[in-house]
A protein has these predicted regions:
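Short, Lys/Arg-enriched N-terminal segments with co-localized hydrophobic residues
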Residues: 4-24
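Active-site loop-to-helix "anion-binding N-cap" substructures in soluble metabolic enzymes
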Residues: 18-276
Length: 276
């Protein structure tokens, strides 16, 4: 299977060879990354609308990741349900003179999850593989489940460097983690050229990256058994219309949803697709 670039053309530089394998059962995982959207009042309204439906969807781990200002309000609304709450970022230090930052201990008061290394953090705020790794280790220390993002830019994709970049980000971001705790980590593959553009990768090509790059790197880090237990999400313009196609792939274990998570009907439909 040839890797396709963002324009959908065959990329001769890199070829992913399909391999036969038996999928280990992993609970599907759907997280909504609201990014810098919704006031506290708007967050309450959105959760009130979609929370009732989401609570009725079983066999899927469902997580909401609103902006920091809305974490407490959303926590109060979803308390006692099976909905999880996640932060969109955090610092690796416990406390100190880090103006504008939030520590893992502060996040732990309300959240169970935290997104780390999102492409927008890497692009706009200088996030590196090293800082992602520091944050991951700090998150684990505080009992938070990290959702670690990896993915290539448009230029890297068109240059045939997808495997190189994604493998490096996976190996460097997750180094120093012991195999016993690695299975709790969630990895999200987000091709940067597909985020917010409406140009999702094909399900087949996303599967090839999940299987032949991300999970292969996880096997090198932690061994085959642990690697098979780690969930790998797809995050790149996932919608209600294309979610089922992605979720049908053996190594796509859910989605990190951006814009569609701000629309109750869309996010509910995506969660339902994951439950099938």
């Amino acid at each position: 299977m040839r890797q396709l670039n963002a324009a959908g053309r065959s990329n001769p530089r890199r070829e992913f060879i399909p391999t036969l394998k038996v999928k280990k059962m992993r609970t599907k995982f759907v997280a909504g990354n609201w990014k810098m959207n919704k006031t506290v009042a708007e967050a309450r309204e959105l959760v009130s609308i979609m929370g009732k439906e989401l609570k009725n969807i079983s066999n899927v781990e469902k997580v909401l990741c609103p902006p920091f200002m809305s974490l407490v309000a959303v926590a109060n609304l979803i308390g006692g349900t099976d909905l999880g709450l996640g932060a969109q970022n955090m610092h690796w230090e416990e406390k100190g003179a880090y103006t504008g930052e939030t520590s893992p201990g502060m996040i732990k008061e309300f959240c169970q999850y935290v997104i780390l290394g999102h492409s927008e953090r890497r692009a706009y705020f200088g996030e590196t593989d090293e800082t992602v790794n520091k944050k991951l280790l700090a998150a684990q220390k505080h009992g938070l489940t990290p959702i670690v993002c990896v993915g290539e830019t448009l230029a890297e994709n068109e240059a045939g460097r997808t495997a190189e970049v994604v493998r490096r980000q996976t190996l460097e971001g997750l180094k120093g983690v012991d195999a016993a705790s690695a299975a709790k980590i969630v990895v999200a593959y987000e091709p940067v050229w597909a985020i917010g553009t409406g140009r999702a990768s094909s399900a087949e090509n996303a599967e090839a990256v999940h299987r032949d790059v991300v999970r292969a790197a996880l096997k090198d880090l932690f061994g085959a058994e642990t690697a098979e237990a780690i969930r790998i999400l797809y995050g790149g313009s996932v919608t209600a219309a294309n979610a089922a196609e992605f979720f049908a792939q053996p190594d796509i274990d859910g989605a990190l949803v951006g814009g569609a998570s701000l629309k109750s009907d869309e996010f509910i439909a995506i969660a339902k697709a994951a439950a099938k």
